[in-house]
């Protein structure tokens, strides 16, 4: 990839991936790497600029995360955010102290709008603070360019050394002018021109795939979800009939989804498609398993085993395609970062894979970028904007062990929920919505009889990047209609609850 590059050094804060997302929204490509990456590795990216993220640690703690000090001598512009600002100060001879009053939430700051970082930003502007410590004495040569009532060094800079830092979080939506500040860093300070465009990504990917694959055969894992569908069409554009797509119907799909996938890819696209119906195989392997991580690993392994079995039938296959995307990689752990949960595409692979290589053409893209790539490729809108669906399917939306009866129950409830959301015209406003079959039963009354059936959870969120998400404010009358239909039309359900937890602290999926 020959795009301009911004490097994001990850110090473990909760908003870190939003930084990468905001940079890309500004048409500049960036990658996230661990804070302790070697100087040689950092230099190898030939980056136009570097951003230090926030983090949960105090720079005053023993063993606090620190980057290679040589970063400050590269001459590359550096922007430190929150912890990144405090780290910059301490490593360059300044000092950090505990604040008399912790700042958390929206705070008004006063900025020096004559400085390049704050061009087109109001002198008094709102920003999002989340800190207990602050820089009380900036390093030699630095000047203060912003302050708040409780933070005398809200931002600082050393223009000659191209070093900049802010105590607040410009990447979050609660800092209204944050995007402008980041663009100022990218364009006014780093000199970026903005060459990260989806059309060039698609074109470059097609060329790279052709060069990599040559005349060899490729097998694609197709689920019918957005990620694997875009990956399949992208690969097909590059190599045509050398691609064979295997659609594994593991019995964990949504209602009618298996037939819809076959209809679209076999008839609408001239793609070699093999549908493998193996519901019994998966359910047998998952029998009695309730731990979500174990479910994911088993499903990932079975997927690969199925692919290997089919590959033997069709002859020599050199490459396996997967629809891994950037949030999959991030949430499965970057460097020393804690693993939130393994993702099917990256954590479910067994150690031995009987293929030459895994190809992950979407590995560097966020979800909305995948959709844009799909539109660029001419994929129909109803497929590009299909609801996100995890690789393990409904297995991680049934809490506890799996049975066919539970899956069928969940399928019916999910279908009703999606049908009513679409009928209400909310399907484009809510980014992801689904039902979860809990492993809890509750007492109810239907007619004159006592019932003791499952409690069902509704989950719906709004998000721009799926790294953070807010629970969707669905109107009460819609929720009432969904609840009434489900308890009347689906056996085994007598109670509906609505999940009003954001991400973080929760993940979007329950497992």
Curated annotation (Swiss-Prot):
Keywords of this entry: ATP-binding, Glutamine amidotransferase, GMP biosynthesis, Ligase, Nucleotide-binding, Purine biosynthesis
Does Ligase show up as a keyword for this record? yes
Which residues are the active-site ones?
82 (nucleophile), 169, 171
Is Cell cycle one of the keywords UniProt gives this record? no
Which reaction is the catalytic activity of this chain?
XMP + L-glutamine + ATP + H2O = GMP + L-glutamate + AMP + diphosphate + 2 H(+)
In this chain, ATP is annotated as bound at 223-229
* A GO MF label: GMP synthase activity
Residue ranges of domain Glutamine amidotransferase type-1 in the record: 5-195
As recorded in UniProt, its EC number(s) are 6.3.5.2
Q: What region holds the GMPS ATP-PPase domain?
A: 196-386
Name any GO cellular component annotation. Answer: cytosol
Gene3D superfamilies (alphabetical): 3.30.300.10, 3.40.50.880, HUPs
What InterPro entries is this protein classified in?
A: Class_I_gatase-like, GATASE, GMP_synth_C, GMP_synth_GATase, GMP_synthase, GMPS_ATP_PPase_dom, NAD/GMP_synthase, Rossmann-like_a/b/a_fold
Its pathway, per UniProt, is: Purine metabolism; GMP biosynthesis; GMP from XMP (L-Gln route): step 1/1
Q: Which PANTHER family match?
A: GMP SYNTHASE [GLUTAMINE-HYDROLYZING], GMP SYNTHASE-RELATED
Role, per record: Catalyzes the synthesis of GMP from XMP.
Could you describe the subunit structure of this protein?
Answer: Homodimer.
Name this polypeptide is given: GMP synthase [glutamine-hydrolyzing]
Please name the source species. Ruminiclostridium cellulolyticum (strain ATCC 35319 / DSM 5812 / JCM 6584 / H10) (Clostridium cellulolyticum)
């Amino acid at each position: 990839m020959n795009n301009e590059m911004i490097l994001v050094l990850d110090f473990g804060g909760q908003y870190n991936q939003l930084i990468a997302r905001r940079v890309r929204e500004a048409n500049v490509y960036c990658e996230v790497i661990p804070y302790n990456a070697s100087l040689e590795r950092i230099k190898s990216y030939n980056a136009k600029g570097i951003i230090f993220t926030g983090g949960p640690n105090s720079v005053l703690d023993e063993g606090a995360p620190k980057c290679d000090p040589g970063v400050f001598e590269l001459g590359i512009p550096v922007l430190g955010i929150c912890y990144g600002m405090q780290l910059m100060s301490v490593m360059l001879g300044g000092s950090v102290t505990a604040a008399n009053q912790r700042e958390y939430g929206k705070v008004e700051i006063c900025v020096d709008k004559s400085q390049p970082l704050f061009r087109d930003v109001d002198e008094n502007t709102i920003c999002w603070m989340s800190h207990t410590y602050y820089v009380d004495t900036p390093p030699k040569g630095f000047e203060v360019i912003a302050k708040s009532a409780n933070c005398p060094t809200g931002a600082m800079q050393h223009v000659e050394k191209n070093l900049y830092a802010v105590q607040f979080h410009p990447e979050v939506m609660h800092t209204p002018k944050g995007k402008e500040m980041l663009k100022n860093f990218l364009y006014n300070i780093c000199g970026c021109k903005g060459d990260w465009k989806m059309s060039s990504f698609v074109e470059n990917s097609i060329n790279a795939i052709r060069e990599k694959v040559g005349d060899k055969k490729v097998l694609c894992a197709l689920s019918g979800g957005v990620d694997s569908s875009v990956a399949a069409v992208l690969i097909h554009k590059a190599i045509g009939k050398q691609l064979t797509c295997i659609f594994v119907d593991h019995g964990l799909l949504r209602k009618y989804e298996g037939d819809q996938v076959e209809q679209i890819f076999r008839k609408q696209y001239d793609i070699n498609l093999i549908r493998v119906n193996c519901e019994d195989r998966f359910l047998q392997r998952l029998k009695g398993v309730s731990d979500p991580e174990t479910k994911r690993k088993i499903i990932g392994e079975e997927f690969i085993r199925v692919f290997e079995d089919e590959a033997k039938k069709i002859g020599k296959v050199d490459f396996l395609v997967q629809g891994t995307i950037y949030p999959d990689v991030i949430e499965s752990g970057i460097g020393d970062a804690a693993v939130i949960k393994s993702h099917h595409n990256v954590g479910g692979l067994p150690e031995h894979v009987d293929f030459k290589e895994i190809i992950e053409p979407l590995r560097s893209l966020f979800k909305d970028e995948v959709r844009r790539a799909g539109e660029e490729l001419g994929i129909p809108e109803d497929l590009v904007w299909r609801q996100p669906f995890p690789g393990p399917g409904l297995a991680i939306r049934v809490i506890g062990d799996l049975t066919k009866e539970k899956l069928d129950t969940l399928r019916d409830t999910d279908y009703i929920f999606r049908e009513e959301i679409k009928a209400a015209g909310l399907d484009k406003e809510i980014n992801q919505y689904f039902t979860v079959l809990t492993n809890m039963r509750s007492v109810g009354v239907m007619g004159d009889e006592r019932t003791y059936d499952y409690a069902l959870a509704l989950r719906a969120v709004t998000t721009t990047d799926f790294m953070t998400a807010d629970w969707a404010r669905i109107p009460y009358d819609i929720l009432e209609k969904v609840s009434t239909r489900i308890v009347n039309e689906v056996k085994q359900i007598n109670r509906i609850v609505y999940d009003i937890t954001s991400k973080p602290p929760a993940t979007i999926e329950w497992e």
